[in-house]
């Protein structure tokens, strides 16, 4: 029989190792050492082998953690999108609201300091993809990208399978990602010191304005 106290202790150790590994892998990629990861986690280096196996296995465990985290954050949006798509004629106001909510959620996540290591990890994988990226892509990025494409296509009357529609969706997502990947630029240009609640709301308003322009523009012209 499992000892509940030992099980809780083990889960805590795994969480600490994942958090430390995300920070180290995000900063150094696979050049990160298990010794530094264990030290940052406050764990014995043998704990990595015990809980995960090799360094490569720990790297994939980080990717799975990211997939689970993103999936949890956006699952309500995906489920609501499916309910909308199941309707014979989805309400356009509801479609727009769901697009805005998904984008607001992305902005919220990408302006928080505690998701920086996640962003670093994914950015490395975007530029030099490994099996870890494909894991995250298949489980959450591709489904969420597809849902947003379908929502935009449904509102504008465009074909969701058209490559140009996918590109328009990707460009919109890129506009939001710019506030994470280009964070230092916008802080210096605006004179801000950080993304607090007030600044994040201003970003939300700006992106909402752009989304409405994009939706109106695409609905009034061919792709």
UniProtKB/Swiss-Prot annotation:
Ligase among keywords: no
Keyword DNA-binding carried by entry: yes
Alphabetical list of InterPro entries matching this protein: DNA-bd_HTH_TetR-type_CS, Homeodomain-like_sf, HTH-type_TetR-like_transc_reg, HTH_TetR, Tet_transcr_reg_TetR-rel_C_sf, Tscrpt_reg_YbiH_C
Domain HTH tetR-type: start-end pairs: 11-70
DNA-binding region extent: 33-52
Main location as per UniProt: cytoplasm
GO terms for cellular component: cytoplasm
Single Gene Ontology BP annotation: negative regulation of DNA-templated transcription initiation
Function: Regulates transcription of the cecR-ybhGFSR operon and the rhlE gene, which altogether are involved in the control of sensitivity to cefoperazone and chloramphenicol. Represses the cecR-ybhGFSR operon and activates the rhlE operon. Acts by binding to a palindromic sequence within the intergenic spacer located between these two divergently transcribed operons.
Record PANTHER family: HTH-TYPE TRANSCRIPTIONAL DUAL REGULATOR CECR (PTHR30055:SF146), HTH-TYPE TRANSCRIPTIONAL REGULATOR RUTR (PTHR30055)
The protein's name in its UniProt record: HTH-type transcriptional dual regulator CecR
């Amino acid at each position: 029989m499992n000892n509940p106290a030992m099980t809780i202790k083990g889960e805590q150790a795994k969480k600490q190792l994942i958090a430390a590994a995300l920070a180290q892998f995000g900063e150094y990629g696979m050049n990160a050492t298990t010794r530094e990861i264990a030290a940052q986690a406050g764990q014995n280096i043998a704990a990595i082998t015990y809980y995960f196996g090799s360094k490569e296995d720990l790297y994939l465990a980080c990717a799975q953690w990211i997939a689970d985290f993103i999936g949890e954050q956006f699952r309500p949006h995906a489920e609501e999108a499916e309910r909308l798509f199941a309707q014979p004629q989805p309400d356009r106001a509801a479609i727009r609201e769901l697009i805005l909510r998904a984008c607001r959620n992305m902005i919220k996540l990408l302006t928080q300091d505690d998701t920086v290591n996640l962003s670093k990890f994914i950015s490395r994988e975007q530029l030099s993809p490994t099996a870890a990226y494909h894991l995250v892509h298949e489980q959450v990025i591709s489904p969420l990208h597809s849902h947003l494409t379908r929502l935009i296509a449904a509102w504008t009357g465009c074909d969701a399978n058209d490559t140009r529609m996918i590109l328009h969706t990707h460009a919109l997502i890129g506009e939001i990602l710019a506030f994470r990947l280009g964070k230092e630029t916008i802080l210096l240009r605006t004179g801000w010191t950080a993304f607090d609640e007030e600044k994040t709301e201003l970003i939300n308003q700006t992106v909402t304005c752009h989304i409405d322009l994009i939706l109106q523009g695409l609905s009034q012209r061919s792709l």
